[in-house]
Amino acid sequence: MNKKIKNAANIELTHRGAQRRDDLVKAALRIIVREGPGAVSLRTVAKEAAASHGLVAYYFGTRSALMVAAVETVCSYIATTFGAIIPDLEAAAPDPSKFAAVLVRYNIDHVVHHPDIGLALYEVNLAGIREPDLRPVLLKWGKVHAALCRKAFIALGSKEPEKDYAFVLYAIGGLILGQSALPRRKFEAEFFAPAVERLIYSILR
């Protein structure tokens, strides 16, 4: 069953209303990528989306609710795209090198080659440092993402799949963040893929 989408007054939205709300969230994400979370407000999103301040307030009510919606959108994208490769990850579990290669391919295709997604993901996580209202939704999605690959990590040989997933996740995140700031030529072949393979073998020692 699809989750019903509502506005700030808890009124269920029509399909058209839900689409308009999505457009406003996308506008907020563009601001986050371009200027950082601190630049997001009901007014700046209204300007970015060529909408009225009242319309943004109708859908979200507060900046906090708007930011939560932005986090939900980014994290949902990661869950959907990552979930699609879980069968490949589980199938590769008997071979750590192949397991690493699946993770590399996913991150290259969905994060490195889509820098706006990667930057938005990092920015909303950083926003959680200063904005406590975002922490519950970040925690919720973190558990969702970890649960998706728990079986694959166990099949790989991990004795503590949640901890090992977190270790690999944040290490990969750091590698990609470094590439975003200081791009390297042949990043995937000469740096990223070998590093991820070492990460995977390290959790099996």
Task: Please give the residue ranges for each predicted region.
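Hydrophobic alpha-helical connector segments
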Residues: 69, 80-115, 168, 193
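Amphipathic alpha-helical packing segments from all-alpha helical-bundle domains
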Residues: 79-80, 112-122, 129-156, 166, ...
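Helix-turn-helix
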Residues: 23, 27-69
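Amphipathic, non-transmembrane alpha-helical scaffold segments
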Residues: 17, 21, 71, 75, ...
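N-terminal intrinsically disordered/low-complexity leader segments
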Residues: 1-19, 30
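Short alpha-helical scaffolding segments that buttress acidic/His motifs in well-ordered protein cores
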Residues: 107, 121, 125, 168-175
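Generic hydrophobic, amphipathic alpha-helix propensity
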Residues: 20-29, 45, 70-74, 78, ...
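Hydrophobic/aromatic-rich alpha-helical bundle segments in the mid-to-C-terminal region
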Residues: 135-139, 154-204
